[in-house]
């Protein structure tokens, strides 16, 4: 008996440890099913939900129950209907709330970007809002699934068809055609879909270029310094460093006026193309069109440690070059915008979280693009739909129950599909750059060991010094120094 008690205790401890390894998982109300198979009996691939799970989505469960209904949970618990305020307590029932053994989280898929050809701003917007398959129908079905009335024209029986697109200030309005007669309550009050507040953000990783025209490099200057050893023993304990400046002059043109609206979110370096060395940085939070050229100068250095024979000098040389390059370029700009739905909600069912039945006029704006806030983010509301009280806008669980999970996933993926516009132009630059540092052959010193017309510097007592021609010292390229190991 003692052994059995110990074994039972060990199993309990083991079970507790296993439970502690896994954090609580969300329960998505749209996947709950009520089975009338008996106390704590579920269909294939389902299990009874626990008291804790039922408590986390109690309001959702109660809204799906009859007034006097009592339904079972796992481990001898029951949940009671609206008349009982959803009380959860020990008890028994002939039916059971169940949840999939392998639930589907149902994330909204991310589709590949919809690319719009380059053009000015109005061209880009026009192409987007007039695209029936990729824009008008997905946004129309979004309004329809949320419960907006009359999302279609008088000459079609289908959602998103016979739609008119009109310019409205800096934006656009999509609304069902109202010409001719219609039948139905308030059928002349078509739901409007307004698209406005467009913004464009450059994607540096989308860079492409066309045919490259590049000149051969041309020698501009040769900088030579001398490491001089006037002692009677070889010297190699010092680095010889040649300092010089590189420069880039660049310019770009923009094919269309959309570039004036495009901004750069983060600073980035212009991509390298060909063999011409460039160092160009594009500033952040600036209009793309405002950055059409400039010049940059960078101070660099190269070092080498020569072994200088006794009573000798060794030349250390670096050559400065220039080269020209030009080519057409293309970037993509991520397009974001506001999507405002305006109309009255259907009496027969709508997804506003309070589910009003008095056909109220309702305006709501979603932001399609970077996150702004909870109220305007479809993805945030969708992902948090399992938390009662967190999403105080649309009841996405209701839309799933009415239309199906896959239908909602596919439609929202199309609504949230990234949109990109092409930004094209021509780029040209002249770059001044350096080759590699080179060490020449030793040259015996003259009897007096002097280096005419030179700036000399002795380092320590070892007899090693540097000599730099004065004409090189006067210009920014070519300063030299020696440092010990």
Curated annotation (Swiss-Prot):
InterPro entries: Aerolysin-like_C, Aerolysin/haemolysin_CS, Aerolysn, APT_dom, APT_N_sf, CTDL_fold. It is found in: Secreted; Host cell membrane. The keyword Lyase does not apply. It holds the Pfam family APT. GO terms for cellular component: extracellular region; host cell plasma membrane; membrane. Its main location: secreted. It comes from the Bacteria. Residues 1-23 form the signal peptide. The record marks 155 as: Important for oligomerization. The record marks 374, 390 as: Important for heptamerization. Residues 446-485 form a propeptide. Proteolytic cleavage and subsequent release of the propeptide trigger a major conformation change, leading to the formation of a heptameric pre-pore that then inserts into the host membrane. Residues 346-355 are annotated as: Interaction with glycans from host GPI-anchor. Transmembrane segments: none annotated. Residues 256-288 are annotated as: Part of the transmembrane beta-barrel after proteolytic activation of the toxin and insertion into the host membrane. Keywords: Cytolysis, Disulfide bond, Hemolysis, Host cell membrane, Host membrane, Membrane, Secreted, Signal, Toxin, Virulence. Residues 68-84 are annotated as: Interaction with host N-linked glycan. Disulfide bonds join 42-98, 182-187. The keyword Secreted applies. GO terms for biological process: killing of cells of another organism. Belongs to the aerolysin family. Secreted, cytolytic toxin that forms pores in host membranes after proteolytic removal of a C-terminal propeptide, leading to destruction of the membrane permeability barrier and cell death. The pores are formed by transmembrane beta-strands and are approximately 3 nm in diameter. Homodimer in solution; homoheptamer in the host membrane. After binding to GPI-anchored proteins in target membranes and proteolytic removal of the C-terminal propeptide, the protein assembles into a heptameric pre-pore complex. A further conformation change leads to insertion into the host membrane. This is Aerolysin-5. It comes from Aeromonas hydrophila. The lineage of its organism: Bacteria, Pseudomonadati, Pseudomonadota, Gammaproteobacteria, Aeromonadales.
